[in-house]
């Protein structure tokens, strides 16, 4: 996986997020992989492009899926389904089932397409971006902010679980934890594993994710491994 490399925030605020950019056939022929940011890649052992990789916008490359912010954990089920865990901005960290050639929405969507607690503030689009003071909490009036519902893509896939979805107006600047980011409503999903044994009762077909607070979360999947049907515990 390759994240969006911190574009559109902090010291990189003037660098555009390229999670939606697809390489041209000319770039692939020239082995220019610069469009691979924000992607999950599928690569043959010799480094070449698998012949059955998906074509995205008419181009076959190492890209297996795109529209990612910071996919970290990857896990395959016994029957070959691929799952990923992904860091969001301040909430809406994701667990996804990855499908070939599908678009997972970033930076237009964080978590579900629900217009809650996230809208796309494209700092890099401002003609005087360098002169702006970056804020992780407020978008300047001079930058057009786009709600999630403004964006459409036929191949968009929502996550099967978010950690966590909060409503508009949520206070991300609580100081009770010592540092604001510690109080953000997320578990900072990193590594991911799938449990398919019958040894622990009722745990078969469960995804396991963890990081923040030293807590382990279990996501029980349905028989098709496409839906989380119990509240994570």
Residue ranges, per PLM feature:
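Beta-propeller domain segments
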Residues: 2-232
């Amino acid at each position: 996986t390759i994240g969006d490399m911190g574009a559109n925030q902090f010291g990189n605020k003037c660098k555009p997020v390229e999670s939606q950019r697809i390489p041209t056939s000319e770039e692939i022929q020239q082995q220019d992989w610069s469009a691979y940011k924000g992607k999950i890649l599928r690569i043959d052992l010799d480094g070449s492009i698998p012949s059955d990789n998906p074509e995205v916008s008419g181009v076959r490359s190492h890209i297996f899926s795109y529209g990612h912010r910071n996919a970290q954990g990857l896990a395959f089920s016994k029957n070959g389904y691929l799952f990923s865990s992904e860091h969001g901005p301040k909430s809406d960290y994701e667990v996804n089932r990855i499908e070939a050639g599908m678009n997972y929405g970033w930076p237009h969507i964080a978590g579900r397409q629900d217009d809650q607690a996230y809208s796309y503030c494209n700092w890099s689009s401002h003609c005087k971006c360098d002169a702006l003071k970056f804020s992780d909490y407020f978008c300047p009036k001079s930058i057009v902010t786009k709600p999630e519902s403004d964006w459409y893509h036929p191949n968009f896939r929502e996550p099967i679980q978010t950690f966590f979805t909060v409503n508009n107006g949520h206070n991300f600047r609580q100081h009770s934890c010592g540092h604001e980011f510690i109080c953000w409503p997320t578990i900072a999903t990193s590594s991911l594993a799938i449990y398919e044994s019958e040894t622990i009762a009722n745990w078969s077909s469960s995804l396991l994710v963890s990081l923040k607070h030293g807590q382990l979360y279990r996501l029980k999947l349905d028989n098709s491994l496409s839906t989380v049907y119990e509240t994570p515990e």
